[in-house]
Design a protein with these regions (language model features):
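Cytosolic regulatory regions of ion transport systems
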Residues: 1-187
Length: 187
């Protein structure tokens, strides 16, 4: 567990922290351990995601494309045409499609079959854009939405809109650092 969301508070867990009812726990694990995590949290029958759409072609999108299982189809929508060409060079996988366009354009999203997408991830450098894009995706029936929100002041507001998962690099990094410290103490 790299973070716990308890009401308005985000906790980077230590060795003594415990989950409470209504907590939202953020896990980080290797692919092979996902079934165990699902079993622990009672989501064994959770339907797998097959179609993913990412708005924004940053490093996180590239990393996601490289680590995604072959059974998943990924569409990355990027506004910058040069970046699209670079993404095509960086990602050479049959199950990944790079689309030049604006991920906020609802006609483009419909054209790219957003209604058949199980997960939508907004990774632009703009928190407001990411939040609104996830809201729009939710309204189009996307089951799982993830918005990158770097402005800490926006996190609780975004969570109150029920847009799905909020990711923040600072919180994730803090969780990694703390986990490394714990690992070093156990050696």
């Amino acid at each position: 567990i790299v973070a716990i969301k308890r009401g308005e508070e985000t906790i980077i867990p230590g060795g003594l922290d415990k989950l409470e009812l209504q907590d939202l726990a953020y896990f980080m694990t290797k692919k092979e351990y996902i079934p165990y995590i699902r079993e622990i949290v009672g989501k064994e029958d959770y339907e797998d995601v097959h179609n993913v759409m990412i708005m924004g072609g940053d490093k996180a999108a590239v990393r996601t494309a490289h680590t995604m299982p072959e059974y998943m189809n990924l569409k990355i929508i990027e506004r910058d045409e040069e970046r699209c060409h670079k993404l095509n060079e960086l990602i050479d996988k049959k199950n990944v499609m790079i689309i030049h366009g604006d991920g906020r354009d609802m006609s483009l999203l419909r054209e790219e079959n957003i209604s058949n997408t199980q997960a939508f991830v907004a990774l632009t450098g703009n928190a407001e854009t990411n939040i609104l894009a996830c809201l729009a995706a939710k309204r189009r029936g996307v089951r799982k939405t993830i918005a990158q929100v770097e402005n800490l002041d926006y996190i609780s507001m975004a969570e109150s809109l029920d847009i799905g998962t909020i990711i923040n690099k600072k919180i994730i990094a803090a969780g990694h650092i703390y986990q490394m410290l714990l690992d070093n103490e156990m050696m």
